[in-house]
């Protein structure tokens, strides 16, 4: 009997230790959590879920209990979980426009968004959820810095590197906003031309339009074949997407032919 008791005790302690190792979600209202966030100097992490969300349940059962999650989240955040369909979760869903589950919010002490991961679940511990959060924070901080006017060469180089991995759509915008002003000569330098070749793949991107409008000058630096191959590849991708999505193909073709004729 004593032996059975000891074995049961060991299993209980093991379960307790595992629970302690994982993420500590506190039973607090949103208002209480914000107050504690301010008092402790930690940001607020909110797991926004619904009862019918399968990935939400997986995260709670298999990911948040991991030691690496506990080490990271418990050290840096006040953590709460909120059902977006009941209690103060309803207000949170409305305030932060939560449309995908799970969504993970990281809030500043005043309730403003520091970072968010919409549909941020992982499907395996091997995917490293902690690193996913860190990457999202890195992107959010870089976006804020860019929006605040940072344009120095070292920052832009690092920012574009981040965007190439995490936000291809924004990358197109940032490259157009920062690279056109360099002029054709600079854009034909190996590093810049490689970026254009690999990342500019949308016919409506201003940088692509700039390339088409100045194709003759680009060709003098890079060779006509090199430039025309790039232009044709972007048009080909556009046609493929149009057909796949069933968009008004004929009208779009007419617009693009006119653009090509004008340049």
Regions found by a protein language model. Give the residues of each.
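Non-catalytic, surface beta->alpha helical segment in thiol-disulfide oxidoreductase systems
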Residues: 99-143
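Oxidative protein folding and maturation machinery
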Residues: 148-263
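Loop/turn elements at helix/coil->beta-strand transitions in domains of secreted/extracellular proteins
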Residues: 40-44, 75-78, 101, 108-112
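Thiol-based oxidoreductase modules, predominantly thioredoxin-like and allied folds used
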Residues: 23-28, 48-50, 62-89, 98
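A short beta-strand-turn-helix
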Residues: 26-43
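Sec/Tat signal peptide C-region and signal peptidase I cleavage site
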Residues: 15-19
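Sec-dependent N-terminal signal peptides
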Residues: 4-13
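Short active-site neighborhood of thiol/selenol oxidoreductases, capturing the structured segment around
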Residues: 40-54
């Amino acid at each position: 009997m004593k032996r059975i008791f000891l074995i049961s005790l060991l299993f209980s302690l093991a379960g307790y230790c595992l629970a302690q190792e994982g993420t500590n979600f506190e039973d607090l209202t949103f208002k209480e959590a914000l107050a504690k966030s301010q008092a402790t100097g930690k940001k607020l992490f909110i797991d926004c879920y619904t009862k019918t969300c399968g990935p939400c349940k997986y995260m709670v059962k298999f990911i948040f209990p991991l030691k690496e999650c506990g080490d990271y989240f418990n050290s840096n955040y006040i953590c709460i979980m909120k059902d977006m369909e009941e209690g103060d979760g309803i207000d949170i869903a409305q305030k932060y426009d939560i449309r995908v589950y799970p969504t993970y919010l990281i809030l500043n002490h005043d309730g403003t968004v520091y970072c968010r991961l919409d549909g941020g679940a992982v499907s395996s511990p091997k995917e490293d959820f902690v690193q996913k959060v860190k990457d999202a924070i890195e992107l959010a901080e870089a976006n804020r810095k860019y929006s605040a006017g940072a344009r120095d060469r070292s920052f832009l180089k690092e920012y574009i590197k981040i965007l190439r991995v995490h936000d291809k759509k924004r990358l197109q915008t940032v490259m157009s906003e920062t690279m056109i002003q360099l002029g054709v000569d600079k854009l034909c330098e190996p590093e810049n031309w490689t970026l254009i070749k690999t990342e500019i793949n949308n016919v409506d991107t201003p940088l692509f339009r700039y390339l088409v409008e100045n194709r003759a000058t680009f060709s003098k630096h890079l060779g006509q074949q090199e430039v025309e191959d790039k232009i044709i590849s972007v048009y080909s991708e556009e046609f493929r997407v149009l057909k796949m999505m069933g968009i008004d193909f004929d009208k779009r073709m007419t617009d693009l032919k006119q653009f090509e004729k004008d340049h």
